[in-house]
Amino acid sequence: MLQPKRTKFRKVMTGRNRGLAKGTEVSFGEFGLKAVGRGRLTARQIEAARRAMTRHIKRQGQIWIRVIPDKPSVQKPLEVRQGKGKGSAVYWVAQIQPGKVMYEMNGVPEELAREAFRLAARKLPVKTTFVTKQVM
């Protein structure tokens, strides 16, 4: 699963997920899966969507993952009283804003890519749409 090799700090503040995304254009592949809503993707969700796409296209073509879970999400253990500091980092999340292209695909027909992205979107907690590369 995806996570940073090293970070400057072990824990970060929760913060807010406001604003619009960077990386809103399909730049590497021919087709893309773009977020319409906002939310948090865990490393497990990103990997589950990648597996669903890879299995559907039967390992032909190429897939790019454009989101990186770089924010630790912390939890306290079960049956532990409140207080005594912040919990330990359990998993990693990527914050998603509207307009972010999360996955890209190349080397497959459009119908196959559309169906693969539909299967991947079922694994993700944000609403998505299918986009193609803009030719100028």
Curated annotation (Swiss-Prot):
Pfam families: Ribosomal_L16. The keyword tRNA-binding applies. InterPro entries: Ribosomal_uL16, Ribosomal_uL16_bact-type, Ribosomal_uL16_dom, Ribosomal_uL16_sf. The keyword tRNA processing does not apply. GO terms for molecular function: rRNA binding; structural constituent of ribosome; tRNA binding. Binds 23S rRNA and is also seen to make contacts with the A and possibly P site tRNAs. HAMAP family: Ribosomal_uL16. This is Large ribosomal subunit protein uL16. The gene is rplP.
